[in-house]
Curated annotation (Swiss-Prot):
HAMAP family: RNApol_bact_RpoC (MF_01322). It comes from Bacillus licheniformis (strain ATCC 14580 / DSM 13 / JCM 2505 / CCUG 7422 / NBRC 12200 / NCIMB 9375 / NCTC 10341 / NRRL NRS-1264 / Gibson 46). DNA-dependent RNA polymerase catalyzes the transcription of DNA into RNA using the four ribonucleoside triphosphates as substrates. Zn(2+) 2 binds at C818, C892, C899, C902. It catalyses: RNA(n) + a ribonucleoside 5'-triphosphate = RNA(n+1) + diphosphate. InterPro entries: DNA-dir_RpoC_beta_prime, DNA-dir_RpoC_beta_prime_bact, RNA_pol_asu, RNA_pol_N, RNA_pol_Rpb1_1, RNA_pol_Rpb1_3, RNA_pol_Rpb1_3_sf, RNA_pol_Rpb1_4. Keywords: DNA-directed RNA polymerase, Magnesium, Metal-binding, Nucleotidyltransferase, Transcription, Transferase, Zinc. This is DNA-directed RNA polymerase subunit beta'.
Length: 1199
């Protein structure tokens, strides 16, 4: 067998008849499979042991030789070699065909490869191959032409006229002869000459033919090999036949298809031997051709061959295609040993890096380890007795299991794994029961809840795997989200509520203004009921453990609450004392106004201070981010555990409940509604008088009711009591929001009908009051659409992620610096006046391309190739700089990847990205994972043509697939001035742009809103009307940079509108993959063919070569490919074939004799090598691990 890790590339090509015979271990002559009496394979049949090897290890067919000592002996009675049975998985056979047949992939594919080589139409080919017409193979000196088709009648007539002077025949034999006669070199030269003169369709056809002929010439494949003389038979274990309970047999469809081929082949041989009339022989040959077609690709031509119950049989092609095919089912996703799955329940007492593993599950997963340990400790004499001990679950087994499990991380995975945080490592602790315990803080990353979710457990076996799991994948290491670099482990729900309740301040609470000497005394007072958690009190500063107080402050009193004293205990001592939820308190220090001199009137001071809001979810997130920035991972994960415990404890103590009485209906709701109704009646009156159009009336009514709802919402939130449980839930960010509350107590507001148009009758009732029947009915539309959308969205979003992963899977950080001198000009992304992404967000974690200087002082803020961190970014923005040149993946010169400098900081770790990081896949996951949060709807606000702009997920797909957008905008192709805007017929408008040399006129579609005015100066690529730009058009009139920028901005716009933040660099990586190819226009003196798509790097290499020789370089135009197209155009045929259109990709690759260099991740997974990313990169693979035992307490210290 091949050593998987030792080959460098993989070739694919056409197999010659001799090659097929050399693979084979014998000819399959009979269609029989198994003898139904003895259940032994028939000799010379499809399962023959002499050809394919023995069915049982070390045992021949007749039983003369048994046992391993006869290894390699060929039995003299039955001819079977004594060897392992698993050779039946690799030994092939063959069938000698009595007549050549065509391979359907090459004759039927689009474009037909056979047709291009012979310059015949696929229709003509089909007529010849399936015996409907004759083709002239040698016209000799008759007026007939080579490759001319003749019907039966014409053929007879010409035979009578010319006798045997000319040769014409039908079937694959005729095509075989034509293919053998082709002189590739001569044809290629003729085509190259033709290209110089031809135009239009002839040129396109010539380019296609040239491509195929060049492919044959360069790859060493012979065109005649597209016709098969001999058919390979795949190993029997890959098309098994198994006996079912009732004595019946279940068999693979391939056996049926092979059987038909063999039957027809044998019948044809017999007919030929008998010298049957040609019409019978021809019919049999046609049937043989159809049988082989069905075997290779059933259903590609004509009606598929069906089995019992009219089910089409699965052919060889179907075995590779689709989700259930070989590629996606068995090569890219395998089931693995040492794994299990179970329901998850919450484990609030676990540490960040722990999970609870049910005892019986752990025992089964770690069985081999436990057995080894039992023998080593002398608790069992040998492995067999150790196994027996485990199966009987004897008490000493548990102690051994405990010791084995310590230090051995396991991986937990929850499907669907949308991003890399869907698999994390934990240290297992044994728990009773049968459910896996999961730490509450990692739920966000897994998107898990405990309503019956299940998770899978996997055990990393080797020392290297365990080390990687512990160092890279431990849950305590994965605190930041790779998509935006923000903490992903922020507390949620109960934890938020507990900390919110704890940090509340209530005026006039019991014991207000008391002074304590230290925290302990305050707690004692609280426990004895003298003060409340929410009471504002004063504490001597010098007794607090916090190290950030100044000497001056240490001699004062601090005004705070008992709850905040408790809250600050969980923060590191060198972190500012948190007394108010502000940015300055988190980043700098506790504000001065909370400090009082000894002897001051504390009660008076407290009365004069306004109430500070409690700590909400967002503030907790900021505290975590700041702690991570200052103290890194270990300290952060310990702090998170303390915050979690505090949250749970105090949300329990708060005892927050929700009752009907908590939902208070607004008093002046009726007045607001009546006022709105009055306005609506007014609008209706205007409409009836013909003062406004139907469209305007609708718009106004909608806006009146929206305003009414907003008024109610505002008043509601104001009228609520601070300690109303529902208000606390929504205000803290634990659950629900203002809109939910408005629907409960205010009014439901406007609803959309099934078409997405807003119904102008609002729902005036709230849930608390109860809806009328009509209101209830109207509500069901929206609810149902929501559920349907969600179901569709999940599938769409998953497919988007899959396409994104496929297009970027080979983008890996390959080197430290690519040495490019280009970059991009980063400025804030805006939409009108609204800022979508601020400049500092775009700069953080990027390398500067040019030095950044202060506009006034000229001081250099950031040097060239220096990393811009948070502080530098803020400094740049405060200096009033609005645009900065930065390094970007767009302009990186590294082939098959990006360099460290152009990529910048790794968002998942907050440090420099490592060489070997698979940034392409991380980018794809970061864009795909929030896909489910995007809306599906195309918003119709009243159906104005200009407003039907796609948003949400469909817009993202439109952008990444580079489709023509809906509601397309017109763009200017030249620089110039808008000379005039004229109304032409049917409300259409004509815009005339006057350039320096020429003028262009554009017709704006009916009703489109213009974005330019007369006399305005515009540049090429500028939008003239409202709508989305077609990026392909934009690329034609401008340059790559403009298109890259446009796509980046548009993608960010969609995500930010939905409140999802994604790092620019992820979108950059994806867009870069879409703009990798160049379409060759003129080949110059290079080897490349005009009209072909080439990778930019191959294109520049080819040009470099000819320029050095002083010849003419090729010219090309950059092409924007959608992600599906880009995936299929990748250099790796394995990756492309496993993505989509498997047969087309393989057909093409085989003809070109493609060579897969195994650079990407997918190719290596398919052939079973380590992926060439991360620790699998060659420069890291040479490192050998040295085992040093150290206890996990040092990794993440115990509490």
């Amino acid at each position: 067998m091949l050593d998987v890790n030792n080959f460098e590339y993989m070739n694919i090509g056409l197999a010659s008849p001799d090659k097929i015979r050399s693979w084979s271990y014998g000819e399959v002559k009979k269609p029989e499979t198994i003898n139904y009496r003895t259940l032994k394979p028939e000799k010379d049949g499809l399962f023959c042991e002499r050809i394919f090897g023995p069915q049982k290890d070390w045992e021949c067919h007749c039983g003369k030789y048994k046992r391993v000592r006869y290894k390699g002996v060929v039995c003299d009675r039955c001819g079977v070699e004594v060897t392992r049975a698993k050779v039946r998985r690799e030994r092939m056979g063959h069938i000698e065909l009595a007549a050549p047949v065509s391979h359907i992939w090459y004759f039927k594919g689009i474009p037909s490869r056979m047709g291009l080589v012979l310059d015949m139409s696929p229709r003509a080919l089909e007529e010849v191959i399936y015996f409907a017409s004759y083709v002239v193979t040698d016209p000799a000196n008759t007026p007939l032409e080579k490759k001319q088709l003749l019907s039966e009648k014409e053929y007879r007539a010409y035979l009578d006229k010319y006798g045997n002077k000319f040769q014409a025949s039908m079937g694959a034999e005729a095509i075989h002869k034509l293919l053998q006669d082709i002189d590739l070199d001569k044809e290629v030269d003729m085509l190259k000459e033709e290209l110089k003169t031809s135009q239009g369709q002839r040129r396109t056809r010539a380019i296609k033919r040239l491509e195929v002929l060049e492919a044959f010439r360069n790859s060493g494949n012979k065109p005649s090999w597209m016709i098969l003389d001999v058919l390979p038979v795949i190993p029997p274990e890959l098309r098994p036949m198994v006996q079912l309970d009732g004595g019946r047999f279940a068999t693979s469809d391939l056996n049926d298809l092979y059987r038909r081929v063999i039957n027809r082949n044998n019948r044809l041989k017999r007919l030929l031997d008998l010298g049957a009339p040609s019409i019978i022989v021809q019919n049999e040959k046609r049937m043989l051709q159809e049988a082989v077609d069905a075997l290779i690709d059933n259903g590609r031509r004509g009606r598929p061959v069906t089995g019992p119950g009219n089910r089409p049989l699965k052919s060889l092609s179907h075995m590779l295609k689709g989700k259930q095919g070989r590629f996606r089912q068995n090569l890219l996703g395998k089931r693995v040993d040492y794994s299990g799955r179970s329901v998850i329940v919450v484990g609030p007492n676990l540490k960040m890096y722990q999970c609870g593993l049910p005892k019986e599950m752990a025992l089964e997963l770690f069985k081999p380890f436990v057995m080894k340990e039992l023998v080593e400790k002398g608790l069992a004499h040998n492995i067999k007795s150790a196994k027996r001990k485990i199966e009987r679950v004897q008490p000493e087994v548990w102690d051994v299991l405990e010791s084995v499990i310590k230090e051995h991380p396991v991986l937990l995975n929850r499907a669907p794994t949308l991003h890399r945080l869907g698999i994390q490592a934990f240290e297992p602790t044994l728990v009773e029961g049968r459910a896996i315990r999961l730490h509450p803080l990692v739920c966000t990353a897994y998107n898990a809840d405990f309503d019956g979710d299940q998770m899978a457990v996997h055990v990393p076996l080797s020392a290297e795997a365990q080390a990687e799991a512990r160092i890279l994948m431990l849950a305590a290491q994965n605190i930041l989200n790779p998509k935006d670099g923000k903490p992903v482990v922020t507390p949620s729900q109960d934890m938020v509520l507990g900390n919110y309740y704890l940090t509340l301040e209530r005026p006039g609470a019991v014991g207000e203004g008391m002074i304590f000497k230290d925290t302990d005394e305050a707690l004692l007072a609280y426990q004895n009921g003298y003060v409340h958690l929410h009471t504002r009190v004063a504490v001597a500063v010098n007794s607090l453990k916090n190290e950030t107080f100044t000497e001056e402050q240490r001699s004062k009193l601090l005004i705070t609450t008992v709850g905040k004293l408790i809250f600050n205990e969980i923060l590191p001592p060198s972190f500012p004392y948190m007394n108010e939820p502000t940015k300055s308190n988190i980043e700098e220090k506790t504000p001065d106004r909370f400090f009082l001199d000894y002897g001051a009137d504390v009660k008076e001071a407290i009365k004069n201070q306004e109430i500070n809001p409690p700590f909400k979810k967002g503030i907790l997130g900021k505290i975590i981010a700041e702690i991570f920035k200052r103290f890194h991972i270990t300290e952060t994960s310990k702090m998170l555990d303390r915050m979690k415990n505090l949250g749970f404890k105090y949300s329990t103590k708060a005892g927050i409940t929700v009752g009907v009485s908590d939902i208070v209906v607004l008093d002046d709701k009726q007045e607001i509604l009546e006022e709105a109704q009055g306005k609506v009646d007014n609008v209706m009156k205007q409409f009836r008088r013909g003062l406004i159009t139907e469209e305007e009336r609708y718009e106004r009514v909608i806006s009146i009711w929206s305003a009414a709802k907003d008024t109610i919402q505002g008043k509601l939130m104001k009228s609520l009591d601070e300690i109303n449980p529902i208000y606390m839930m929504s205000d803290s960010g634990a659950r629900g929001n203002a809109s939910n509350f408005t629907q409960l107590a205010g009014m439901r507001g406007l609803m959309a009908n099934p078409a997405g148009r807003i119904i102008e009758l609002p729902i005036k009732s709230s849930f608390r009051e109860g809806l009328t029947v009509l209101e209830y009915f109207i509500s069901t539309h929206g609810a149902r659409k929501g559920l349907a959308d969600t179901a569709l969205k999940t599938a769409d979003s998953g497919y988007l992620t899959r396409r994104l992963v496929d297009v970027a899977q080979d983008v890996i950080i390959r080197e430290t610096d690519c040495g490019t001198d280009r970059g991009i000009l980063a400025k804030a992304i805006t939409e009108g006046t609204e800022v979508i992404e601020r400049l500092e967000e775009r700069l953080v974690g990027r390398f500067a391309r040019k030095p950044v200087k202060h506009p006034e002082t000229g001081e250099v803020l950031v040097n060239e190739n220096e990393l811009i961190d948070e502080d530098k970014a803020i400094e740049i923005v405060e200096a009033g700089i609005e645009e900065v040149w930065i390094r970007s993946a767009f302009t990186c010169n590294t082939s098959h990847g990006v360099c460290k400098r152009c990529y910048g900081r790794n968002l998942a770790t907050g440090t420099d990205v490592e060489v070997g990081e698979a940034v392409g896949i991380i980018a794809a996951q970061s864009i795909g994972e929030p896909g489910t949060q995007l809306t599906m709807r195309t918003f119709h606000t009243g159906g104005v043509a200009g407003d039907d702009i796609t948003q949400g997920l469909p817009r993202i797909q439109e952008l990444f697939e580079a489709r023509n957008p809906k509601g397309q905008a017109t763009i200017s192709e030249i620089d110039g001035v808008v000379a005039e805007i004229n109304e032409v017929r049917d409300k259409q408008q004509e815009i005339v742009v006057q350039g320096e040399v020429e003028s262009r006129s554009y017709t704006a579609p009916y009703n489109a809103r213009l974005k330019v005015t007369e006399g305005e100066k515009i540049s090429r690529g500028q939008v003239l009307t409202e709508g989305s730009v077609d990026p392909k058009e934009l690329l034609k009139v401008t340059d790559i940079t403009t298109v890259q920028e446009y796509l980046l901005h548009e993608v960010q716009k969609v995500y930010r509108m939905q409140g999802v933040e994604i790092g620019d660099k992820h979108v950059e990586v994806m867009v870069r993959q879409m703009l990798r190819k160049v379409r060759v226009i003129d080949a110059g003196d290079t080897e490349v063919l005009p009209g072909t798509l080439l990778d930019i790097h191959q294109f520049t290499e080819a040009n470099k070569k000819v320029l050095l020789e002083g010849k003419r370089p090729a010219t090309g135009r950059p092409v924007l490919l959608g992600i599906t197209k880009a995936s299929l155009e990748t250099d790796s045929f394995l990756s492309a074939a496993s993505f989509q259109e498997t047969t087309r990709v393989l057909t093409d690759a085989a003809i070109k004799g493609k060579r897969d260099e195994l650079l990407g991740l997918k190719e290596n997974v398919i052939i079973g090598k380590l992926v060439p990313a991360g620790t699998g990169m060659l420069n890291y693979r040479k490192v050998k691990p040295v085992l040093q035992v150290q206890s996990s307490d040092e990794m993440v210290p115990a509490e």
